[in-house]
Amino acid sequence: TASINNSSQSRDVTFIADVRTAQIAVLEVTQDNAVADGAMANTLRARVTDAFGNTLAGQTVSVMAGNGATVAPTVITGQDGTVEISVTSQTAGTSAVTASINSSTASRNVTFIADVRTAQIADLVVIKDDSVADGAMANMLRARVTDAFGNALAGQTVSVMAGNGATTAPTVTTQPDGTVEISVTSQTAGISAVTVSINNSTLSQNVTFIADVRTAQIADLVVIKDGSEADGLTANTLRARVTDAFGN
């Protein structure tokens, strides 16, 4: 507005934000803890301004994501200077998302979690075998539970069965690394098939129990031929059977 005496006139002038000083003013996580299924996304919002805090529309922001996560390499700010960034992953854990423009950079961490809906027995390994069939000494197995993309799943309940009269806990729970050890005892010598399952996923491994020589005993002694001639040649015969304390 210009004025003199009682005379004045006004005109509008426009100042525009300075794209030369474009910077990442804010980078915030707006959704976190998405499932690591390659489809569900964590989201962030970036805001671009000039050096004096004026919002900048139509600016190209470069984006990178760590730990195997997927993100569009560039995004463009809207009229308010903000832009939403969507990040997906098939790898559970933390992903560092970095947004940059000119020489201005900001980073935030987002977290992807394993998908319990696709829990499966990834492997079942015998870690101790050939235990004595005394009902106390145990064969051991280790099961590992993951989601469909191989991410470890903690706190999952695994069902367990053992054949040939062996004894095991009916359920076990996985540790933070997705594994759990399974103890199996038996009083019956021989092979026991141990089966673990979760959802529709099942694996089996055989373990072997051996008779306990420490408790060897004569279980029975039977005459199988008697009344032979006393000629020093013809023999009477008997059959002895030796077992451990549990009849193995």
Predicted regions and their residues:
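The feature marks long extracellular or luminal low-complexity segments
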Residues: 1-248
